[in-house]
Amino acid sequence: MTLPLLVVLSLLNGCAEKEKFIVYGSTQNESEVETLIKEEDYVDRSTVIQYDDSMLVAVQIKPWEKWKKTKLEKKLQKKFEKKYPNKDVFVSADYKIFYEANKIKKDQMEDTKLSDKITELKELAKEET
C-alpha cells in the first residue's frame, strides 16, 4: 500500500515546476526584465546575467516554437534593445549558452572572470550561427 503512494509522490515531485527565471549580477531592474520575458509566451525558461553595461539573456524556447527559434530570438533582442538602449544586450536561444549561463550563476563567479566569460559566450554564439 505504501509503495504505490511513494511512487505517486516521487512522480509528482519530479514534475514540480523548476525555477523559470533567474537573474544574476546587478538586480537594479530585475522586475522589469522578468516582466519583459514573461510577456513572451514562447519562452519556457530564462537566465539573465547583468554585468556593468552588458546584459546576457539566455532563453529556452517552448518545444513547438523551436522551428521559429531565430525569428523569436531576434524579436526578443529588439525588445530588450528598445527597453535598454544604453546597455549592450545579447539574447540567445541556444541551449549551450543557456547551460553555460546557468553554470555561471551556480558557480557565483567573481567580477573579473564574469566579464571574460560573458565575452566568451558571445563569441561562442557567433561561431555557432
Predicted region positions:
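Sec-dependent signal peptide recognition
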Residues: M1-L6
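C-terminal motif of bacterial Sec signal peptides marking the signal peptidase cleavage site
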Residues: L11-G14
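Bacterial signal peptide processing site
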Residues: A16-K18
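Short, surface-exposed ligand-recognition loops at beta-strand->loop->(often short) alpha-helix junctions
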Residues: I22-Q28
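Catalytic cores of large soluble enzymes that bind and process phosphate-bearing ligands
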Residues: G25, K68, K113
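Short, non-transmembrane amphipathic alpha-helical segments
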Residues: E30-K38, K66-D88
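Post-signal-peptide N-terminal segment of Sec-exported extracytoplasmic proteins
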Residues: T35-T70
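C-terminal low-complexity, charged extensions that often adopt amphipathic alpha-helices
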Residues: Q77, E81-T129
